[in-house]
Amino acid sequence: MKQKLRSSVQIILLFALTAVGLTGQSYPGKPKIIRCRSLEKETFSCWWKPGSDGGLPTNYTLFYSKDSEEKIYECPDYGMSGPNSCYFDKNHTNPWTTYNITVMAMNEIGSNSSDPQYVDVTSIVQPDAPVNLSLETKTSASTTYLLAKWSPPPLADVTSNSHVYRYELRLKPEEKEEWETVSVGVQTQYKVNRLQAGVKYVVQVRCVLDIGEWSEWSSERHIHIPNGESPPEKPTIIKCRSPEKETFTCWWKPGSDGGHPTNYTLLYSKEGEERVYECPDYKTAGPNSCYFDKKHTSFWTIYNITVKATNEIGSNVSDPLYVDVTYIVQTDPPVNVTLELKKTVNRKPYLVLTWSPPPLADVRSGWLTLDYELRLKPEEAEEWETIFVGQQTHYKMFSLNPGKKYIVQIHCKPDHHGSWSEWSLEKYLQIPTDFRIKDMVVWIIVGVLSSLICLVMSWTMVLKGYRMIAFILPPVPGPKIKGIDTHLLETGKSEELLSALGCHGFPPTSDCEELLIEYLEVEDSEDQQLMPSHDNGHPSKNAKMIAKETDSDSGRGSCDSPSLLSEKCRESRAILSTLQTQDIRDVQENNGRRHWETQCIASEQKILLFNNESTKSPIWPAAQLPDNQPPMFAYHSTVDVHKITLCTIDVNIAPVLVENEEQHQPQYPITETVHDNMEKHREVENLYSKTDQTTVQVKQNRPNDKSPFSKPKLMDYVEVHKVRQDEVAAVLLKHKENSGKIEKYTVPGTSKEYTKVSTVVDHNILVLMPDSRIQHIPVSQEPAMEMSQNLQQGQTEKNMSYCLTVPSECKRETSASEYMDPSSFIPAFK
C-alpha cells in the first residue's frame, strides 16, 4: 500500500514539474548572504543577494537564532538599512552573542534557503567614513600651509560623544600614483606643510574605533596651491664624514626656495652644552657643506646639527642629526695604484699590485690603522672578484688568463670604527699571450696525439672488432660432454634434455628420420655362393609367429619406436589391398622367368612385427616353415626402412654359432639387400598380401646339396647398438627362442660392435669389422673355427665377386648404407 502511495506521489510531482517546465515558472533560486557589519558596536545590519525569482513574485525572510537559545527569530527591521537587508537595533543586538542567520526565498511553487552565516558583533565592527571633509590654504608667520577639516561618521541612535575615533589622512599630487599617509589621531583637523606652489593635491580621510576594522576612505577632495610667494622647503642633511679622524665635514640638500633667494645656515650644539654654534667654514668642503677643522672638532663628543633655510617669506629647519666623530670616519681611497706583470724562472706570469694609503690619513704615527680590499675583473665581464688584502700595501695575483685585459680597484677602512672608502680609480692591465705559447704547443701536441690514438683504435675496432671483443670478453665455454647437444641445452625442453642425458624418467626421443638404417647386407659364410633359387615357395599361412625379445636394454636398440613402424605398415597394407586382384599365376611366371629378382624383393612395410606391449626394445618374431624345415635367416630391421628387399637365394649357409655369458646374444648373419623398381616390388607384394605379418627369410640349400656346414639357424638382426650421423652403425644379435627352448650361442666376447670399416665395394657397400675382443669358444668348436679360418680367404673373394654381379635393378636407386659382416664368413661346426 505504501509503495502504491509513493508511486502515485511521484507521478503527481512529475506532472507538476512538467507543467512548470511548460509554463517557464519554477521555485526561487538560492539567496546568498553578502555581509554583516556593525557601525558602532551597538547595532548591526546584514545584506543578502537574491537568486532568481522563478518567474513569480518572491518574498525573502531572514531568520536567526542565538547560540544560547533554540528559538528562531525573524528580522526585526527590513527597511532601515535598505533593500535586501535586515537591521538589528540595540534591543536585538548583544555584543557577546553569536548569531546563526539564514535567508529564505519563497514563491507560489516552492522555497529555497541560503547557507547559514555565523555572526559575532565584535568582529564585524566597521564605522562609516568621516564626512564633511574641507580643505583650505592659510599663511601664518610668512608660511603657507594646508588646513584639512572633517566630521565623524553620523550615528543614528547614539550621541557623538559616546565613541572615540582615530583618523588617518592621505594626500598626493594629482598627477602621481603614490599616496603620502599621515596619522592624525583623534582630532578632526590637520595642517599640511611643505606643499609645492602651483601643484594640485588630492586628500582623503578615514577612521577606526578601538576594535574592528578601518572604515572606507572618504570621498576625494581636491585643492590647488597658488603660485604666490612662500617660505622655502625644509632642507635635508645628507651625511657627515671625517677623512682622518681629526676633522669632519657635513653636507645637506636644500629644498625649494619659495620663489625668493634663500640662505642656509648650519647650526650645532655639543652634548652637555646649551649654546648653539654656527658652521665655522662653508667653503672648504664645497657648496651646501660645512667643514669642521681641528679646532672645532672634539672626540668623544656628540654634535647636534641642523640646517635652516630662510627667505623673505619665511624659514624652515631640517631634522636634527646627531654626530660622533669616531663613527663617521671614512678615509679617502688609496692612491698611487700600480700594476706590474712579472714572470718567474719557469716563465709563469703573475701580477704585482702596489698602492699608497690616503694622503690625509696619519698611518705612520699609528693614529689610523687601515685595512685594504681590492677587486678585479676582465674588461668584458660583469661580476667583480673581491680579495681582502689586510694592512699590506702590495699583493701578488697568479693564474691570470693570457690575452685578456683586467680592471683593478682598491679601497680601505679603519680597523675599528668607520666605513669603507670609495673605490680608487680604475687601473687597466693587458696580459700578453706570449707567456703561454709553450703550454699551447704542448696542448696542441697532446690533442693531435689523442686524435691519432682515437683514430687508430676506431680503425682497429672496425677491422678486428670481433677478435678484440673475444680477447677482452672471452666466450664462456659450453659443456663438452659427448652426446650433449649444446643447442638443446639453450633452447630444448626438459624432456629432451633428460633424454639426451640418458635419464629414464621421460621416454627417450630422437630424430628417427636421420638415424634410419636403410639396407643391411649379410653373408653367412665364405664358402656359400649367392646363387639363384628355383624355389618359389611362400611362407605358409599357418606358420607360427614366435615373438623374440632382445636382452639389450641400452635404450638405443632401435631408433624407431613400434608405433612409428606400425604406421608405416598400415600405409603399405592400404597399397597392397588394391593389388590383391592381380593374378598370382602371372606373378609366378614372372618369378620363374626372373626368379632371382623376385626373391630379392620383399614388402617394405611387412618385414617387421612388433610387440606394442613391451616397454623395452621391440620384439621381433621369426617365421617357421610348415614342412619342418629348419628356420631360415630372418631379417628384422630396427629402423624406418623405405625400400628393403632380401635376396632369398639358394645358398648353403653355415651359421656361426656364438654364445655369450648370458646366452642371449644371437650370431651375426649377413644378407644382401637389393633394391628393385616399383613394378617388381608391387608384384611381390601381391604374393604376400594375404599375410598380415611376414618375415623375410633366406632359404638354405636343398637337402640333397652337399655342404660341409651344419644346418643354418635363424639369425635375427634386431637392434642397432650405435647409430649416429657421425659414426658407423653397430648391429647386435637378438635372443633366439625355438619351440620353447633357448639356444645357446657362443659370443666372441661380452658384446660385438661393428665400428670399423674394412673396405668399400661398388661405392655403396661397406664391409664392417667388429671390435677385436677376447673370444670364449668351446673346445668342441675349435676345429670348426680352424676350418673357417682356412676357407676365409678363398671364399671372401667369391662372395665379393657375386655381390658385384647383382643386377643394377636389385640395387637401391638412392644412396643407402649397405652392411656386410665379414665375421659371418667364418664357418662353424656342430
Curated annotation (Swiss-Prot):
Matching SUPFAM superfamilies: Fibronectin type III
Binding-site list for Zn(2+): 415, 417
Disulfide pairings: 36-46, 75-86
Signal peptide: 1-23
Cytoplasmic side: 461-830
Record field: transmembrane: 440-460
SMART domains from the UniProt entry: FN3 (SM00060)
Motif placement: WSXWS motif: 420-424
Gene3D superfamilies referenced in this protein's UniProt entry, alphabetically: Immunoglobulins (2.60.40.10)
Primary location group: membrane
Pfam families: EpoR_lig-bind, fn3
Glycan attachment points: 59, 91, 100, 112, 132, 263, 304, 316, 336
Subcellular location: Membrane
Extracellular compartment residues: 24-439
Residue interval(s) of motif Box 1 motif: 472-480
Membrane topology note: Single-pass type I membrane protein
GO terms of molecular function: cytokine binding; cytokine receptor activity; metal ion binding
Domain annotation Fibronectin type-III: ranges: 30-128, 129-228, 231-331, 333-434
One Gene Ontology cellular component annotation held by this UniProt entry: plasma membrane
Keyword Disulfide bond: yes
PROSITE patterns the UniProt entry points to: FN3, HEMATOPO_REC_L_F1
Domain notes per entry: The WSXWS motif appears to be necessary for proper protein folding and thereby efficient intracellular transport and cell-surface receptor binding. The box 1 motif is required for JAK interaction and/or activation.
Function: This is a receptor for the anterior pituitary hormone prolactin.
PANTHER family: CYTOKINE RECEPTOR, PROLACTIN RECEPTOR
Family affiliation: Belongs to the type I cytokine receptor family. Type 1 subfamily.
Protein name as catalogued: Prolactin receptor
Organism encoding this protein: Columba livia (Rock dove)
Chain's gene name: PRLR
